[in-house]
């Protein structure tokens, strides 16, 4: 199969590319950075350098593909984050219509079924609906949980406050996921036949927030590390 992978060599797209190349597929990786070309080619894939905000570029890149893995690259500098995310989804849809690609595996998120109240994920609600409106195109949305590596954002909190916390309680459950498991799920969906529009949730483990704090604390030599709500968000 000829497969296009968006997301450059990110935490999901890199292992996904490796899986697909190893399986014998002809893979092209989209990246906005020309300096990634050598690294992409070293994986056995082709590089398509350009911006997902450029519909003409996407149309050229999508041409001839049997399947496309779509994701919206983060852009926290966007003045309207939902508008940015929705816009990338619209760009993908235009390129899909123009090129006749028949199979899409799209990275979405848990919570993308809700139109409001989920922060940036609202944009992924829009993307799902935009792609679902494509006629004659099989679309599978992957809805992963909370990425394990998101805990890196709490390093300074642990160092300087001696706690791990957020705006939810230690007894609340977290659906945790490894990017490698998302890549596995994406590769599986790309390589197996499916029709229509569908959703696949991707979760590696389920823990309470308190359990997560205890596990991380034990791993870094801070067995006293606790999950706290409130003080971390005063």
Please provide the spans of the model-predicted regions.
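Cofactor-binding loops of NAD(P)H-dependent oxidoreductases
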Residues: 50
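Conserved small/polar residues in nucleotide/adenosyl-binding loops
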Residues: 232-234
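Short, conserved active-site loop motifs that form the nucleotide-linked donor/cofactor pocket
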Residues: 44-45, 139
């Amino acid at each position: 199969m000829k497969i296009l992978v968006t997301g450059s060599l990110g935490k999901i797209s890199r292992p996904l590319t490796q899986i697909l190349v190893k399986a014998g597929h002809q893979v092209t990786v989209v990246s906005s950075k020309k300096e990634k070309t050598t690294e992409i080619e070293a994986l056995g894939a082709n590089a398509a350098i350009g911006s997902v905000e450029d519909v003409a570029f996407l149309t050229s890149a999508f041409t001839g593909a049997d399947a496309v893995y779509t994701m919206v690259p983060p852009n926290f500098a966007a003045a309207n984050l939902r508008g940015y995310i929705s816009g990338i989804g619209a760009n993908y849809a235009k390129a899909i219509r123009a090129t006749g690609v028949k199979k899409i595996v799209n990275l979405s998120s848990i919570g993308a079924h809700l139109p409001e109240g989920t922060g940036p994920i609202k944009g992924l609600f829009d993307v799902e609906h935009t792609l679902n409106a494509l006629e004659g195109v099989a679309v599978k949305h992957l809805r992963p949980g909370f990425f394990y590596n998101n805990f890196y954002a709490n390093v300074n909190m642990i160092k300087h406050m001696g706690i791990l916390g957020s705006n939810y309680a230690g007894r609340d459950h977290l659906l945790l996921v490894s990017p490698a498991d998302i890549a596995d799920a994406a590769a599986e969906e790309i390589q197996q036949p499916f029709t229509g529009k569908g959703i696949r949730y991707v979760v590696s483990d389920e823990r309470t927030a308190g359990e997560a704090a205890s596990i991380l604390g034990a791993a870094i030599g801070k067995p006293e590390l606790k999950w706290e709500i409130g003080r971390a968000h005063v």
